[in-house]
Amino acid sequence: MSLYFNADTMRIERSSVHEPKRNRNVFLDVKPIADDANVNVPPRQAARRNATVFNNRVGFPPLTPKEAFVDAVPADQTCMVFESSKPIYLVLRAIGVLPYTRLPSGGTAFVLASPSMTYCVLFFLLLTVYIAFILLNRIEIVRTLEGRFEESVIAYLFIVNILPILIIPLMWYESRKVVSVVNGWVDFETVYRETTGRALELRLRTKAQVIAILLPILCSLSVAITHVTMVDFKLLQVIPYCVLDTITYMMGGYWYMACETLSITAKILAEDFQRALRHVGPAAKVSEYRSLWLRLSKLARDTGFSTCYTFTFICLYLFFIITLSIYGLMSQISDGFGVKDIGLAVTAFCSVGLLFYICDEAHYASFNVRTNFQKKLLMVELSWMNTDAQTEINMFLRATEMNPSSINLGGFFDVNRTLFKSLLATMVTYLVVLLQFQISIPDEPSAMLMHSNSSHS
């Protein structure tokens, strides 16, 4: 028999070392049942069920006397993650990328026969028709170009900039997985609230609002700068390019918010776990945090898998844009920079920044979910804990080793800083080859002079 102080109930409770071990298996695919789901159950039947299966939750004990007097949590507080990123979701739906539907129960769903899907399809068809006319015009401009390739990089770049329209159908294909991740966060918040007694507070709403407002403005500004520096500037051609750039960078904003949510949640969970270890009695408390961490680790993996094809395409597209833009800039070094090179510089800078943030935020989220949590576990003092608690701590450490928390794009590659370094190294290799190929080709005036000299001789 051992005594310990429970900070939640403010009482000294006792636990027996020789008590029979209850089943603490963690089922990550089981949806937790809210406390108010069993209002009509008779008291005797509810008490019998609580005594046997812990109120049918995922390894959690029944309510404490303190929690019995807590009011039910409002529905809008059970999906704080969605509410924090809601401005970005609204912008993505407005530009036809993410046709999600909010259910009356508070969940999120992807329904083909829904008003949001109909709007996204109509928006995509109108944008496709608009871009088709612009593409024909751009192809005609490329055909009439004369001179070397490096002198017409911007014209080719405008054709490549049409490719982000493929993001829309790719996201439609993956919207069901994205919605599943959003609902997974709702389940995580439910389990977190039942474990800690309070709601998950992220405080990311302001960041999401800033991203949703500033990114479309900055994208439109960069596209306008690029078009103004062109000789054949046409105002009507700026609008679809602004939409396409907004789609690309708003997907970057979505990725940033997803990774930032993982990072902040991992930090909060680590602090709560460290605070709970100060008064650990039964080993069930450690088991509860282990189940929470396993859910968070699964959410980190699902974040990458849910948009694997979309962000694989975005990374390859950004790599191609960066290579083409920097090649156009470096090829003009001998002739000096002009006004038209401003657009190339802006495009290269923005693309490098977006690619860096995609890789860096995923790296930071993976570090906080796994490595930072392992440090907290390794710093735990086990000498004063009972045997069951020590066993649960060791099982927790083993779980962090066996469950990878890296954000992986469908098995293609891990998104981290190593990916950014590899892409830059490959880009430098391509640039060196292209510049050597350019140097080996003589200019037209020198070629004509050599031809005239040979004819005179």
UniProtKB/Swiss-Prot annotation:
Assigned keywords, A-Z = Behavior, Cell membrane, Glycoprotein, Membrane, Olfaction, Receptor, Sensory transduction, Transducer, Transmembrane, Transmembrane helix
Chief location category? membrane
Give the UniProt subcellular location, in the record's own words: Cell membrane
Report the record's disulfide bonds: none
Q: Which residues are exposed on the Extracellular face of the membrane?
A: 137-152, 231-237, 331-341, 443-457
Q: In which tissues is it expressed?
A: Carbon dioxide-responsive neurons coexpress GPRgr22 and GPRgr24 in the maxillary palp, at both larval and adult life stages.
One of its GO biological process terms is: response to carbon dioxide
The residue ranges for the Cytoplasmic side of the membrane come to 1-115, 174-209, 259-309, 363-421
Gene Ontology annotations for the cellular component aspect, listed alphabetically = axon; dendrite; membrane; neuronal cell body; plasma membrane
Domain of life, source organism: Eukaryota
Enumerate the transmembrane spans. 116-136, 153-173, 210-230, 238-258, 310-330, 342-362, 422-442
Q: Which GO terms describe its molecular function?
A: olfactory receptor activity; taste receptor activity
Q: Which residues are glycosylated?
A: 453
Write down the membrane topology: Multi-pass membrane protein
Q: Which family does it belong to?
A: Belongs to the insect chemoreceptor superfamily. Gustatory receptor (GR) family. Gr21a subfamily.
As for what it does, the entry says: Gustatory receptor which mediates acceptance or avoidance behavior, depending on its substrates. GPRgr22 and GPRgr24 together are sufficient for olfactory carbon dioxide-chemosensation.
Annotated protein name in UniProt = Gustatory and odorant receptor 24
Identify the species of origin: Anopheles gambiae (African malaria mosquito)
Its lineage opens with: Eukaryota, Metazoa, Ecdysozoa, Arthropoda, Hexapoda
